[in-house]
Each structure stands twice: as structure tokens, then as C-alpha cells.
Amino acid sequence: MTDTGIFYGTGAAEGVPSPFCDCPMCNYAREHGGKDVRKRSCFRLGRNIMIDMGPDIFTQALQYGSMCDIEHVLITHTHDDHFNFTALGLMSMATHLRTTPVHFYLSEEGYRFIELLRDSEIAFGGTLRGMEKKGIYAFHKLKYFETYSIGEYEVTPIRGNHGGNMAKERSANYVLKAKDGTKMLYGMDTGLYEEETLDFMKNQNLDIWISECTFGNLKLQEEWNTHLCCLLYTSPSPRD
């Protein structure tokens, strides 16, 4: 598993450099480019699985190549920087349309967002249902802590501590188990996990843990409990 993952984007919602920010970090990224530029969050696992599909999908495809092999997209939550539904329209604009759909997976509350889009003129003039019927893509509802067979992996969504576009939505972080037994947690977006999730994770015996540090070196504050900071991993008391 370690040699099949590619980070297409590791930035927060505003990316780096942020379009409307002239802080030293953003200005440095504009000047130097390269690794200091961060596109919005997206991770590709192997040939056909992707985690999140945000607003930088066009640029990411330019940099990393065709996405025609993608068959499964695990959505962590419905914020635009992780699930940019307008990207769905790109799949219907291909000269050679797919013969099998791209499968999108969301939490139960995240799936409600899809149900709203199906009946909304905002989503391609109300044609989302029609594109589903044509087999361009399909949407699936996942329950937290239940395991599903997706592609070549066993996938278990766990409850994150981060909202989405729906009022009661909480992010889905994903535990993925490969055929060789290697187990990985893709843990973003989230704040500090709640007890239910911590209890589930106690016996998972992870080999790889991918997490976030949105707040960098800032001290973790209670009101920020939707993201994490670097001090969480380096200090026994990240709020001190």
C-alpha cells in the first residue's frame, strides 16, 4: 500500500497560496512554487480509488495524468474543497463515455446532499438523475463502523469530528485494509475524535496513519474542534 498512494492535494479549503492572502507564507509560496504550493485535499490509492474530489481536479489531472481509471471515490464530507459536485459534469463531457459508472461513497448524512442535488436546478439544470440513469456515476450510502468491499480494499468509514454542508453531517474518515493485511487510516477532515470512534480504533493495529494538521503550530483551542494541529502529535497537552 505504501508505494501506491499519491497525494494530489494536501491544502485546506483556501489552498496555498490563498488567493486573497498576502501573509509571508502565501507570498513565499507564490515566489518559490514547487512543494510550497498546496492544492485542495485529494488522495489517489492505486489505479482506481480516490479519496475526495475537490475543485482542483483539472489541475491535478494535468500534473498527475488521466483519471479515466478511477472507479471508486470515497467522499469524506460534502464541503466544496473535498466534494466539488460540479466536477461530476466533467464526466459527462468526455468524447468517449465510460461503459461503467464511477462510484461515489458518502456517509448517511452526506448522502442527503446528493438527494438534494438530484432535485435541484443548481446541479446541471436538474439533470443529475438523468446522468445517473445513463450510468455515468452512481452514489452509495455508507454507515459508520461497517466494513465494505470497495475495489481491492476492505473499507470501514469511521465517524470524524468535522461538519459538512448538511446540518447533522459529520465527516467520514476511512480505514482501508489491503489484501496483504496492511491497514491505513485516512483521517481528515476531523477534530479530536469522540469516544465512540476512539473505542473502535483501539484494536485496529494501523500500519499507516494519514492525518491532518490544519492549524499548524497553533495551540489547539476548544472552539477549533473541527481540525487538528501539529502539537497534538508532539505534546502531551496540545492546549498548553
Q: At which residue positions do the language-model features occur?
A:
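Conserved small/polar residues in nucleotide/adenosyl-binding loops
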Residues: Y233-D240
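Active-site metal-binding motif and surrounding structural segment of the metallo-beta-lactamase
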Residues: N48, M53-Y105, L206-W209
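Short, glycine/acidic-enriched loop or turn micro-motifs at the edges of active sites
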Residues: P55, D80, G191-L192, F215, ...
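Core dinuclear metal-dependent hydrolase active-site scaffold
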Residues: M1-Y64, F139-T197
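Structured loop/turn residues at beta-strand edges in well-structured enzyme cores
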Residues: C68, T100, G135, Y153, ...
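Metallo-beta-lactamase
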Residues: L176-L228
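Active-site neighborhood of divalent metal-dependent phosphoester bond hydrolases
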Residues: R98-P101, E108-A138
